[in-house]
């Protein structure tokens, strides 16, 4: 049994909204990264569902690209978090406005 496209898009929209709220409302850089990952997963779900509904492999190709983008985002974000924590800082997002300055 194939799930209807409207159901897949509704779940993707809900997942995207949860990720957007999490990324916008949180102060911790780790929780912001998790919110962005939710949003990327929602986009991948929408692409995969649309590809399945229209019998097209472009949706699966887009999911592979999104997975690569998500892994690059996670790597850069966690490197930023480790860099900030090693400098005696915190994981709060508002403390990252002065990374380039010498203090």
Swiss-Prot record:
Q: What is the E.C. number?
A: 7.1.1.-
Chain segments carrying region Disordered: 84-103
- GO terms for molecular function, please? NADH:ubiquinone reductase (non-electrogenic) activity; quinone binding
Here the segments flagged for biased composition (Basic and acidic residues) are 88-103
Q: Which reaction does it catalyse?
A: a quinone + NADH + 5 H(+)(in) = a quinol + NAD(+) + 4 H(+)(out)
Q: Which UniProt keywords apply?
A: Cell inner membrane, Cell membrane, Membrane, NAD, Quinone, Translocase, Transmembrane, Transmembrane helix, Transport, Ubiquinone
Gene3D superfamilies in alphabetical order: 1.10.287.3510
Name a GO CC annotation attached to this entry: plasma membrane
Q: How does it sit in the membrane?
A: Multi-pass membrane protein
Q: What is its main location?
A: membrane
The portions of this protein that span the membrane are 1-21, 29-49, 62-82
Cell compartments where the protein resides: Cell inner membrane
GO biological process, any: ATP synthesis coupled electron transport
Give the enzyme's main class according to its UniProt record, as a single word.
translocase
Q: Can the keyword Membrane be found in this entry's annotation?
A: yes
Superkingdom of origin organism: Bacteria
Q: Does the keyword Transmembrane helix apply?
A: yes
Spell out the subunit comment.
Answer: NDH-1 is composed of 14 different subunits. Subunits NuoA, H, J, K, L, M, N constitute the membrane sector of the complex.
According to its UniProt entry, the function of this protein is described as: NDH-1 shuttles electrons from NADH, via FMN and iron-sulfur (Fe-S) centers, to quinones in the respiratory chain. The immediate electron acceptor for the enzyme in this species is believed to be ubiquinone. Couples the redox reaction to proton translocation (for every two electrons transferred, four hydrogen ions are translocated across the cytoplasmic membrane), and thus conserves the redox energy in a proton gradient.
What's this protein's family per the entry?
Belongs to the complex I subunit 4L family.
Protein name per UniProt? NADH-quinone oxidoreductase subunit K
